[in-house]
Amino acid sequence: MNPVPAQREYFLDSIRAWLMLLGIPFHISLIYSSHTWHVNSAEPSLWLTLFNDFIHSFRMQVFFVISGYFSYMLFLRYPLKKWWKVRVERVGIPMLTAIPLLTLPQFIMLQYVKGKAESWPGLSLYDKYNTLAWELISHLWFLLVLVVMTTLCVWIFKRIRNNLENSDKTNKKFSMVKLSVIFLCLGIGYAVIRRTIFIVYPPILSNGMFNFIVMQTLFYLPFFILGALAFIFPHLKALFTTPSRGCTLAAALAFVAYLLNQRYGSGDAWMYETESVITMVLGLWMVNVVFSFGHRLLNFQSARVTYFVNASLFIYLVHHPLTLFFGAYITPHITSNWLGFLCGLIFVVGIAIILYEIHLRIPLLKFLFSGKPVVKRENDKAPAR
């Protein structure tokens, strides 16, 4: 069994927090992009569309690598059942809390903003269910995927650990070329599966729960397992934390290919399959770019960084309805896209931090939005002398 490192990986904590917080400018820029969303500005901005595409092209791939890294670290720390329980509680409880407190009010607001409240009674039972699946899971989808991955990895991590006990891990060698070929094949495999489903029964691809539980899990699971392997094999981790011009150049070229596919691809043709292949290898190369950058600049501890690491999940959870509120009721009154974008950042981040500070002072909310039980200090229990 691998020993759990005593020193905390500060740069990975920081990267994970920044990737979470990048969801704020991502969704605000989505309002001002050429992509159709719940709410959009009158005229799209080319540069904010480019900025939005850049974040979207790699953010969650890198996030799931870090999640897999820390998940395997905890897998070695706890017994199997306790590990599953702890991991599911820490992502499942915040997700279940956010549905009635955040995404349900958000859904009701959007029904009136988009003028769909009157047509709701006329929808079929399945359409109501599917609409609620998309709208109530909403930006919480990655938490649902983490619950599914954690459950799958009860078996996968056991197999990995058993294989390690029967082999010499020091002889395992990794190269970015080999990994690139593997992830290219994984991307092609995912594209084949999606195209097959599209041919056999296309309506299932528009089913919200199928999309989240099956398709998203299928795409991001290789990154989650890659993170676990990076924890196990120091050579693999060093491969990601060492700057590589090849990875940077390859990522830049892949991003250009991603943009071209967005611009000229067609959803009725091969756009989504092509995107899955591109983003699979782009995500791998961006792990090197982000890890090496973060290892060089973010590998330290500070009170400010710790604050945002702890606050990142809560801020991400509450930012989405705040962003949609801003887009629906404030964006129409700001003529400049860039000014609207900056005002949106100030509005959303400011209110999110205020709400975070309020929730810290309410033990029940603190538990519900973190999944961590409130631990009382021994000093609090000791009688006064």
From Swiss-Prot:
GO terms for molecular function: acyltransferase activity, transferring groups other than amino-acyl groups; transferase activity, transferring one-carbon groups. Keywords: Acyltransferase, Cell membrane, Membrane, Transferase, Transmembrane, Transmembrane helix. Necessary for the succinyl substitution of periplasmic glucans. Could catalyze the transfer of succinyl residues from the cytoplasmic side of the membrane to the nascent glucan backbones on the periplasmic side of the membrane. NCBIfam families: PRK03854.1 (NF003014). Disulfide bonds: none annotated. One of its GO terms (cellular component) is plasma membrane. Signal peptide: none annotated. It is an enzyme of class 2 (transferase). It comes from Escherichia coli (strain 55989 / EAEC). This is Glucans biosynthesis protein C. It is a multi-pass membrane protein. Its EC number is 2.1.-.-. Its main location: membrane. The chain crosses the membrane at residues 17-37, 60-80, 91-111, 137-157, 173-193, 212-232, 239-259, 274-294, 311-331, 338-358. Belongs to the acyltransferase 3 family. OpgC subfamily. Pfam families: Acyl_transf_3. It is found in: Cell membrane. It comes from the Bacteria. GO terms for biological process: glucan biosynthetic process. Coiled coil: none annotated. Pathway: Glycan metabolism; osmoregulated periplasmic glucan (OPG) biosynthesis.
